[in-house]
Amino acid sequence: VGIRAFSSDLISASSYLRDYVEKGGNLVTQYNRTDDAWDSQTTPPRPIKIGSPSFRWRITDPNAEVHYLVPDHHLLNKPNKINQNDWKGWQQERGLYFVDEAAENYQKLLSMADPGKKPLDGALISGKIGNGWHHHCCLILHYQLEHQVPGAARLLANLITPADWK
């Protein structure tokens, strides 16, 4: 589900998306603003609170160092092993509208910081929900893809690949 896609029309599909994940689906959602139709309790399959005010929940330095919080997680390893080279050449910024809090199903996978600021760890989260997975990505992948940043394409491939892919 693309950036800021949760409008009033798509909100009505939240229960369908939740059911899809619980039955084994792989759902990828991208960033949403707190003033979009995103309800932290009912829009995602399990609660996810977006940080507010939004200007404090973003990484504006496209060269900010990225740390792996769960390095063996499948999103960082299949089908592509995501490494520090994948963060080179990023344009504009790393991401925005980061997650502040999430249900215990979710793991926060990355940490990064703007110069002189505290690290944020809500850029990429992943949770096992029933028989499926929900990944919420606040990185600006669409912008990186427009600028042909290979690491963004590699990470996107990982996001859409089922967890049991061999």
Name each model-derived stretch:
Residues 5-91, 149-151, 155-157, 161:
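A glycine-rich, often tryptophan-bearing local segment used as a flexible ligand/cofactor-contacting loop or short
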Residues 1-8, 140-141:
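The substrate-binding groove and active-site-proximal loops of carbohydrate-active enzymes
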Residues 93-103:
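Active-site Gly/Thr loop motif
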Residues 28, 48-55, 59-62, 82-85, ...:
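Extracellular ligand-binding/catalytic regions of CAZymes and related secreted enzymes
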Residues 13-15, 94-96, 122:
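A generic local structural motif
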